[in-house]
């Protein structure tokens, strides 16, 4: 499992980081995540994979908690997992088993598939919030993520997909779209994370557009735990 910092633009400091799955082939080269995640999704293994990552992430959070580290962890959950009626119960069981602090956890709803039952998803996400966790809507603007999800689901964060972020300093249409998403999100009381920030130019535009947090290669690539700088800040 790898970790990618997410930095608060107001303080310039890392406030949380996202847990990301990475796999190597026999030659030690990285396998594109889409390749093995698509296989897991098509074979019905996504829930099992999600729960393995969730438990590992929670155990890492406990290590940080005992060391006095306040960094929050963002953990991806896919639609097939959230569609399970006992999802929130299983999360509570993992919390109890690991001793993790739910207040330090953010669950990111990843849209590899459309939700089968949005009412069930709303109920389960609210249960996670009752535990103390926060909810993020990932990849906003593409795929199955829609304004309906923003309206119907109890999310705390909106993550703008990198397709609208990487060249926001060059493309007027992207700036208009990002500005609209930020205004809508703030109007609904939600915070905004821009992912895919790969340049200083993009960072400065996003700051001017009142984005709350940024994530991307300009800050840090995903790294293993032993290479993660818990004092990551915005580059000078």
Annotate the PLM regions.
Residues 1-100, 112, 126-127, 147, ...:
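Bacterial c-di-GMP phosphodiesterase EAL domain
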Residues 9-13, 26-27, 61, 78-85, ...:
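EAL-family c-di-GMP phosphodiesterase catalytic domain
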Residues 37, 90-94, 123-126, 152-154, ...:
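Glycine-rich, phosphate-binding/catalytic loops in enzymes
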